[in-house]
Amino acid sequence: MTISLRNRPVGVAATAAALALTALAALATAAPASASGPAPATALAPASAAPGEPTAPTLPRPTGRYATGRDTLFLTDHTRTDPWVPAAGPRQLLVSLNYPARPGTGGDPAPYMTEEEARLMLAQRGLEDVVPPALVGATRTHARTAARPAPGRFPLVLLSPGFGTPRATLTGLAEELASRGYVVATADHPYESTGTQLPDGRVLTCAACDKVDAQPDDAARREVLAAVPAGRADDFSFLLDRLTGPDPAWRHSRTIDPRRVGMAGHSIGGNAASSTMAADRRVDAGVNMDGTFFDPAPVRGLDGRPFLMLGTDPGHGPGSDTSWDDAWARLDGWKRWLTVRDSGHFTFTDTPEIGEQLGLEDPEAPLSAARSTTITRSYVTAFFDRSLRGRPARLLNGPTPANPEVLFQRP
């Protein structure tokens, strides 16, 4: 679901802030129409506003037994030219690494995003003069910068955000997985987000979005969108080389077990998970959270590797997005197709928590922030526990009374 607020009148600043945060990442989502521009405005109802100025939101605390740390890597792939802006030179990646940490170590809580990145997200919705970008950028996280890693070696999970969406929107899931004993690498793909601020201060905007918008019809837009997950597969193969190869870029690379690698993504990032698995045998398992398969799953399947499709209901139920029906037929390993009642496209990101804390109610996605967070964390973690650790995952065996919103699709 894409929510457009560009032409929506607003009242008090607190209400506008809440509305804006629902659209933090909504440039392009699961369908070509939404990829080419804003969808018609969705009716949004603000809850009763609390008096006073809004305060920075706080992400839900991770539930695992580990404290979490965060490092950031800025990597350059000198073997590839950037596909969206060739004049920029080699392809570059900005990567957040969340990892299990020793308690009591590290510095301040890691930042959510920069103020400029927040401003660009709000500007895309015409709200940069209404919502303080600093409020969005100051969202409170739980990982500590430069914390000492916990002893041991841990499976690696790669995370890829939606098209036009910063990697920050998957921070809550990254921290949860790290607290459960995973190293998590979340990538910003240059020129595929509203704004990515590099360590030297440069800001890269969404040239890929502009290219999609410039196409004359849906078929042409789909062709460009199919290049996004295919290109991200190259990004993640390069990232795997730099994290697990003989000359690793990360100082704590010894904590990664390279024999156990999974990948999850939101929206087109979920398609990138299957594309990366198709291109790189090192990725053992994948999750698509509500993303259309613009780059189809291979006809031959994924060599028996497990895959979870987790989406909105009915938006990604059988027959709603035919790319999911096609992918389901091609997946040749252990697989599950789950949909979530009352959810929206951004249910699987940090957006519900941020919006709800600022008093937002979205009639088209009435699932609460708490349930959105619990469902996403529980099912994604259960899948990786099963696929990368060989642990029983009863949650994935069928419907449970504790999660009545989660539907098991068996087309």
Task: List PLM regions with ranges.
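Secretory targeting and sorting signals
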Residues: M1-P38
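Alpha/beta-hydrolase-fold serine-hydrolase catalytic core, especially in secreted/extracellular enzymes
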Residues: G37, A49-P60, A67, H78, ...
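Domain-level recognition of soluble alpha/beta enzyme cores
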Residues: A49-V157, A365-A369, V380
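Active-site machinery of serine-nucleophile hydrolases
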Residues: N98-G104, P111-L127, T169-Q215, R341
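Short substrate-entry loop that stabilizes the transition state in hydrolases
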Residues: A138-F154, L159-Q197, G315-P318
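Alpha/beta-hydrolase active-site loop
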Residues: Q197-T255
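Primarily recognizes the serine-hydrolase "nucleophile elbow" in alpha/beta-hydrolase
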Residues: L239-G301
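The feature captures the conserved acid-bearing segment of alpha/beta-hydrolase catalytic domains
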Residues: D284-T347
